[in-house]
């Protein structure tokens, strides 16, 4: 008989809106350690997960052997759980780490809890048990995250959310499909994607889509839907500069066509060859459409940057919010000036209607509508990151700084980032020699460590 009994805890809060998480508790067939402490830790751990807004599945019956593990996994799969958290309140059977690795291909989050405070006997060896499991999973080449701490500790809860987001990101990538309309922009060969390397490394599939067929789709969007969308654009309150409201219709068509295509093809992300065909054939750049879609939480990239769209998808899945996909325009040793011609997510710009708010304008080069001109917000923590392919492998990097007021103003979207520790001259040179493409992503948070941990989880080579 198990020495871990059913765990009574309060019902989850707002269960209808919660994300289902598999929470398995490793029990013991033989009595041992401090089972009162074990039970208390289980109750507090599950309650902490529920307080964080997760709907926990599987915690009510302990995992004792292969048979109970199979039953537990059937339940969590039926509930659609993307992430699996393994609790080991007292040290259990290490052999089950390999059984779980065989049955659950996605990353596993191991949570080790503290010993009972005070003198006397060892109460649980929870950290020792999870150390054992982690070592075995690594030697089996199975990705995992390890969290250690008390259920009531704020830092522990933050680590749990991060670890579960990382695990679900890897799981989502394995089942994701990214669409690419056309190819990379002319000459931008550094953005070329390898569909089979993507499948082998990240698990996702690349779906090639016809640019001429997309143009036909843009032209055939229902007029009533276009009129409704133009009203939605007006409500954004964006100023007009060298454009008129007559220019809004074509970009609404692009916006609706991209949304329609993503829905029809079940795409988790989309990138588009935005020039030269679109400005020449439909008369506009689709950049307002991209700025709106990214602000709404869709992973959409320009110039055929497949890896850029994938990185956007990763960031959103990790809970990092939207990213600005941009050129690295210039730098000195402590600052980098990022610029692109007008498709930054609207929520990363200053508020519409304000002094520095964005406006709708014409592209600086092929002088046609419709781009979003506007600085991005300064005074914010910032991370600059990139995922890329080189030498038949994937690589990733990220580093942190802070956005500061720009030294000069350009059309398009710009932001000046200061890196306190400097070293950007050497960093840029090293990154180019590592094959990093000319686009990077910028997030409004310090999240370099989240990128490092995701790279480790995915088996992607990390560049510090």
Predicted features and spans:
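Extended hydrophobic packing segments that form well-structured cores
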Residues: 367-464
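Short Gly/Thr/Asp-enriched flexible loops that form oxyanion-binding sites at enzyme active sites
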Residues: 92-105, 279-291, 420-421
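Cofactor- and metal-binding active-site motifs of prokaryotic enzymes
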Residues: 2, 62-174, 186-187, 337-339
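N-terminal glycine-rich anion-binding loop in soluble enzyme alpha/beta folds
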Residues: 2-63, 189-238
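C-terminal catalytic subdomain
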Residues: 297-409
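Alpha/propeptide regions of enzymes that mature by internal proteolysis
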Residues: 42-86, 246-264
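Conserved, well-structured core segments that form the ligand-binding/active-site neighborhood
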Residues: 46, 128-321
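Short, solvent-exposed amphipathic alpha-helical segments in soluble enzyme
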Residues: 39-41, 101-103, 193-201, 286-289, ...
